[in-house]
Amino acid sequence: MSSKRAKTKTTKKRPQRATSNVFAMFDQSQIQEFKEAFNMIDQNRDGFIDKEDLHDMLASLGKNPTDEYLDAMMNEAPGPINFTMFLTMFGEKLNGTDPEDVIRNAFACFDEEATGFIQEDYLRELLTTMGDRFTDEEVDELYREAPIDKKGNFNYIEFTRILKHGAKDKDD
């Protein structure tokens, strides 16, 4: 009994609180997708992602990672990478990169009237002709769940919120 209490005290330190917040950050379907990704990387199915798992996964994608590269990736984790740590690391990355205002400002460059909307046809043209060009099929996929009103206005402020926090629950 006393050893269980000692273990319980050990697990209640800061990392445990951080991970519980991470689970609250994602909805159940997102967690399931992360679990599937974790299982694909965990090649030896031991419940942990190690250097060999990373190497095998990257090799299966046609990459030939160096030991230094793999070590750098492994060193981003403060300890063994189980699913909870994996989710925590993704949560930190998702929160730490491309803040909402950066995404919003990227869209705002094409919203001369500062309305929060871009005409869907204009956005399609931009996405298929500039930068890393989308195919029409990719734009169709984007628009399937995008906040577009009946007048064809793409609500990029709401879209940015969806990107960062997920879609609002709907009863299917």
Swiss-Prot record:
It holds the Pfam family EF-hand_7. The modification Phosphoserine is found at S20. Gene3D superfamilies: EF-hand. Transmembrane segments: none annotated. The modification N-acetylserine is found at S2. One of its GO terms (cellular component) is myosin II complex. Residues 29-64, 98-133, 134-169 form the EF-hand domain. Ca(2+) binds at D42, N44, D46, D53. GO terms for molecular function: calcium ion binding; myosin heavy chain binding. The modification Phosphothreonine is found at T19. Phosphorylation increases the actin-activated myosin ATPase activity and thereby regulates the contractile activity. The keyword Metal-binding applies. InterPro entries: EF-hand-dom_pair, EF_Hand_1_Ca_BS, EF_hand_dom, Myosin_RLC. The keyword Cytoplasm does not apply. Keywords: Acetylation, Calcium, Metal-binding, Motor protein, Muscle protein, Myosin, Phosphoprotein, Repeat. Myosin regulatory subunit that plays an important role in regulation of both smooth muscle and nonmuscle cell contractile activity. Implicated in cytokinesis, receptor capping, and cell locomotion. Myosin is a hexamer of 2 heavy chains and 4 light chains. This chain binds calcium. This is Myosin regulatory light chain 2, smooth muscle minor isoform.
